[in-house]
């Protein structure tokens, strides 16, 4: 392969407001497997990851901790690097948006865009979601909340700079049409097209209300808004706009940006629009993968449903966790993490299939041939079948990796491993060993098994980087044997094997599930206690003191007359039907009976409640609210349900007991 064959792959840069969890690890391990495989193919790879360290949330977290924002992120970034080291992540460069060279690049980019008229000063009036760091207009909100995360938004009114995203709407649509592989999976591309066609707004790219950010060089009271800062990392890390690195011409454009689906919009609309404005080449592909779910929802530290990858690696081994993430989750879709799935995958694939094949093969080689077997030609149909599977494996895995169907690549590898295990049962080496006349046939069988292990071991090196060398070692080979060009049957003439430790000891399922359940309960209890303490501290902090002591003026909503309040009709209603809407991930469509008639209510609570959780329950509604057309008039919502925000950013609903009649007035 020629020296100029390069491959540039990036993870999103992670927000270090707290330690990362297994969901973040999923993205990075997937990128690592792709990077390792490309290196095995002979590519000169640049694998970039890093941290996005500016913004309101970091500023607030640091203030709560009594340290500067830089001191706060320094501590978290150290844990991020430790985690990637633990998970055998082979990144080539780690960028921090607080690095001087990155800030220099961002300021040059911002200035260039301003001077050519693609950035202008204006006034932002709208809404801001702090957790998502996103700005929204009235029409984009869902039930008055952030359409991405469902949390409360804050009114924002400040002077700001804007990037002319709207200017590039037609070019973006043309990009998608002419480059159908630019956005993957296909469903995500359709979402982006719909978002643009509904009317693309210019993007706010500075904030005066946030102090922790890169200052606009010609107007320093304006720190840059997160996305211009964050997105530019993909080129600043290569030396664009700075003299720290000099790899831009070699590696840009990126071959693959891997991101979570929640930030795909910024990477496929704002980022290419910025690059168009800068007259720079566009990345070749952006892949928006799904979420790793637990207990039916996205992992969240505040809910207490996160999984610490460090604990998992300590208990089961790094490669077991890497394998689970890469094999279990359908790439591009959401996937579920459960303790049962993890243990069953380790036992069935790693301990039973792979581990048993290696241990049985090595043991038989030692028992029947003193540990040394040589190439002996196969003479039966099942030999040719196994040889064919071995010889065709690399092409299948390569196609899957190129298509980003990583679980399918592992399925192909393990199909050969499973076929080799079946081959043992079919050839019965222990029976062949009883007759000296079968010695050549016996050696041929064991050689076929060694070859199956060698070739699958080479390919597994991209996914299980500490296991593959162990496999080679037990086969009597060194690390140089992990050569993709040698993944053909017969490439290794002789094996001198020796027994080693079990690759993946089998786990007692019942015992382990009980242990993990206990640990889960402890973690949830700790999270609940922490949330309660946080809420109590916040309440105490905000509690009004006596006027003569504090002089604090607490602002409330304007008073209304008692007669006006009496006009609001509050009643108990029974949920008779409830379903998700195909058109919205946020809304539930409820059919409720208020004692007189059934009515339709649309409510933005789909993130926290499943339809089956609500059917048959009695809830409070505003019964005389004027009907409101929603979803472009397709539905009409005839009321509003009672719901409250929880301390952790969730949602709770007041349910009424059996002794409360449907239709009762709420006073």
Task: Identify the meaning behind each predicted range.
Residues 1-3, 37-44, 65, 69, ...:
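Secondary-structure transition/capping motifs at alpha-helix termini
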Residues 2-76, 95-111, 115, 132, ...:
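N-terminal catalytic cores of NTP/NDP-binding nucleotidyl/phosphoryl-transfer enzymes
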Residues 116-169, 173:
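Cys/His-rich short segments
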Residues 468-564:
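Intrinsic disorder at enzyme termini
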């Amino acid at each position: 392969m020629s020296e100029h064959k390069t491959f540039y792959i990036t993870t999103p840069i992670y927000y270090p407001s707290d330690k990362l969890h297994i969901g973040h690890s999923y993205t990075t391990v997937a990128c690592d497997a792709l990077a390792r495989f490309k290196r095995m193919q002979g590519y000169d790879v640049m694998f970039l990851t890093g941290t996005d360290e500016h913004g309101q949330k970091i500023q607030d977290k640091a203030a709560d901790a009594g340290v500067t924002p830089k001191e706060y992120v320094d501590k978290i970034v150290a844990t991020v690097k430790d985690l990637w080291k633990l998970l055998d992540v082979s990144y080539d460069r780690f960028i921090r948006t607080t690095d001087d060279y990155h800030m220099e690049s961002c300021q040059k980019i911002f200035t260039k865009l301003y001077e050519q008229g693609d950035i202008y000063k204006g006034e932002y009036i709208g809404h801001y979601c702090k957790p998502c760091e996103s700005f929204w207009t009235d029409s984009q909100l869902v039930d008055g909340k952030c359409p991405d995360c469902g949390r409360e938004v804050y009114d924002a009114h400040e002077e700001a700079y804007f990037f002319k995203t709207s200017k590039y709407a037609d070019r973006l649509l043309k990009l998608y049409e002419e480059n159908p592989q630019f956005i993957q999976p296909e469903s995500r591309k359709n979402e982006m097209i719909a978002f643009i066609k509904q009317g693309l707004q210019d993007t706010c790219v500075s904030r005066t209300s946030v102090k922790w950010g890169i200052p606009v060089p010609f107007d320093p009271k304006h720190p840059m808004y997160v996305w211009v800062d964050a997105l530019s990392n993909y080129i600043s890390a290569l030396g664009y706009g700075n003299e720290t690195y000099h790899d831009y011409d070699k590696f840009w454009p990126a071959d693959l940006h891997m991101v979570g689906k929640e930030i795909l919009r910024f990477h496929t609309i704002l980022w290419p629009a910025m690059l168009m404005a800068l007259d720079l080449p566009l990345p070749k592909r952006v892949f928006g993968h799904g979420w790793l779910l637990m207990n039916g929802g996205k992992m969240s530290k505040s809910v207490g449903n996160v999984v610490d990858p460090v604990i998992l690696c300590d208990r089961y081994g790094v490669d077991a966790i890497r394998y689970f993430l890469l094999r279990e989750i359908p790439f591009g879709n959401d996937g579920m993490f459960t303790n049962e799935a993890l243990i069953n995958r380790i036992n069935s694939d790693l301990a039973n299939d792979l581990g048993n094949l290696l241990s049985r093969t090595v043991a038989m080689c030692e028992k029947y041939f003193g540990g040394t077997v040589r190439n002996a030609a196969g003479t039966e149909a099942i030999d040719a079948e196994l040889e064919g599977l071995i010889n065709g494996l690399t092409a299948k895995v390569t196609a899957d990796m190129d298509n980003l169907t990583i679980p399918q690549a592992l399925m192909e590898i393990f199909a050969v491993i499973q076929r080799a295990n079946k081959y043992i049962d079919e050839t019965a080496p222990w029976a062949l060993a009883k007759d000296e006349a079968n010695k050549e046939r016996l050696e041929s069988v064991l050689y076929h098994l060694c070859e199956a292990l060698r070739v699958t071991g080479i390919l597994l090196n991209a996914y299980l980087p500490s296991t593959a060398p162990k496999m080679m070692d037990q086969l009597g080979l060194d690390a140089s044997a992990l050569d993709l060009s040698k993944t053909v049957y017969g490439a290794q003439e002789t094996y001198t094997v020796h027994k080693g430790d079990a690759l993946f000891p089998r786990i007692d399922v019942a015992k382990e599930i009980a242990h993990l359940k206990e640990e889960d309960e402890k973690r949830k209890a700790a999270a609940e206690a922490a949330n309660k303490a946080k809420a109590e501290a916040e309440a105490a902090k905000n509690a009004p003191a006596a006027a003569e002591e504090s002089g604090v003026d607490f602002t409330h909503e304007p008073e209304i007359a008692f007669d006006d309040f009496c006009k609001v009709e509050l009643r108990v209603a029974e949920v008779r039907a409830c379903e998700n809407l195909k058109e919205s991930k946020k809304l539930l469509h409820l059919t409720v009976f208020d004692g007189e008639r059934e009515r339709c209510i649309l409510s933005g609570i789909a993130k926290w409640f499943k339809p089956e959780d609500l059917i048959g329950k009695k809830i409070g509604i505003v019964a005389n609210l004027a009907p409101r057309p929603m979803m472009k008039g397709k539905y009409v919502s005839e009321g509003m349900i009672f719901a409250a925000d929880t301390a952790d950013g969730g949602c709770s609903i007041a349910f009424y007991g059996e002794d409360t009649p449907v239709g009762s007035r709420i006073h």
